[in-house]
Regions:
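Short cysteine-rich clusters marking metal-coordination/redox-active sites
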Residues: 5-8, 23-26
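Cys/His-rich microdomains that often coordinate metals
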Residues: 9-12, 30
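Short Cys/His-rich micro-motifs in 6-15 aa windows
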Residues: 27-36
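Alpha-helical segment of the N-proximal tetratricopeptide repeat
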Residues: 38-65
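Residue-level recognition of tetratricopeptide repeat
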Residues: 56, 72-74
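Short coil/linker segments at helix-helix boundaries
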Residues: 86-135
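Conserved N-terminal substructure of TIR/SEFIR domains
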Residues: 137-224, 244-254, 261, 282-294
Length: 294
């Protein structure tokens, strides 16, 4: 049976019956699933694959499916919590070690998360428990740093969500239309988060504090897209799905899907129930601003 590394996706070298192993590719030592058969192991690898592809909602759902069969599965609880926090492991160019980056920071500490506590409680041995605790402590420090930066950010009125580049790395039309919306709204005196401009002086790994602050403060999200696959692109969906989660606890928030050159019936199912706007219609900006006041 093959177990894939949580850090890089390489094969884990382990002794049958062991609770942890070392990746043949990146050298990381990590806990491993206690899978009795290949089918269950494939479910772990699938969930892990989703997380490494930054498809965090799919990863959480996959781990929760495993937990439906056994809610004492420490490795599934751990997979669920690092997926919920959007943990991606990237290579440190200096040390070549894999370090965690957090793409979905939460206000509550990872150390108080129910899945983390369940992983520690149900760890199969002391070494696995130690690995969970040490890794969670690393993530908690990263979390503190992100929250400290985001606390200094002024609140936003609007968050614009869109796909910046296409499959060839070229700027999308969506980006151009999003910029038009950005200027139209800022002219009205609104503070707008538009990543192309808002994040232009930030480094890639420093994006999350500003995205987190903007998502949590903005009362309106505008999701712009011209293709179904752009609405469903990993980072686009990560933003609007996070905002939908916030809307569940704050009914004053508003999300407006804005489409162009596509059938509105092709919007993602989660967005299809919301009042959308056709960007090609005359008076689109006026209708958009009117939507803010509803």
């Amino acid at each position: 049976m093959i177990i894939k590394c949580k850090m890089c996706g390489g094969d884990i070298d382990f002794i049958p019956g062991a609770t942890y192993g070392t990746c043949e590719y990146c050298g990381s030592t990590s806990t491993i699933p206690q899978a009795e058969d290949e089918n269950k192991l494939n479910r772990y690898n699938r969930a892990n694959h989703f997380r490494r592809q930054c498809e965090f909602d799919k990863a959480v759902a996959a781990y929760e499916k495993i937990l439906e069969q056994d809610d004492t599965d420490a490795e599934a609880h751990w997979g669920a919590v690092i997926s919920r926090f959007g943990i991606e492991y990237v290579e440190d160019p200096a040390t070549h070690q894999r370090i965690p980056t957090c793409h979905r920071v939460q206000v509550a500490s990872i150390l108080t998360d129910e899945d983390y506590l369940a992983a520690v409680e149900n760890a199969p041995d002391e070494e696995s428990r130690r690995i969970y605790q040490e890794e969670a402590a690393r993530i908690a420090e990263i979390q503190k740093g992100i929250l400290a930066i985001s606390a200094n950010e002024k609140p936003y009125d609007v968050f614009i969500c869109y796909k910046e580049t296409d499959e060839n790395g070229q700027r999308t039309r969506d980006s151009q239309w999003a910029q038009d919306v950005y200027y139209g709204l800022t002219e009205q005196g609104l503070k707008v988060f538009f990543s192309r401009i808002t994040l232009e002086d930030k480094l890639g790994q420093q994006y999350e504090p500003y995205i987190f602050a903007a998502l949590n403060s903005a009362k309106v999200m505008v999701v712009i897209g011209s293709r179904p696959e752009y609405f469903n692109a990993v980072w686009v969906k990560n933003e609007w799905s996070r905002y939908l989660s916030l809307m569940k606890h704050d009914h004053k928030r508003l999300l407006i899907p804005c489409y162009r050159d596509m059938d509105p019936y092709d919007l993602p199912e989660e967005l299809s129930m919301l009042q959308s706007q056709d960007m090609s219609k005359i008076g689109f900006m006026q209708d958009l601003r009117a939507g803010f006041r509803r």
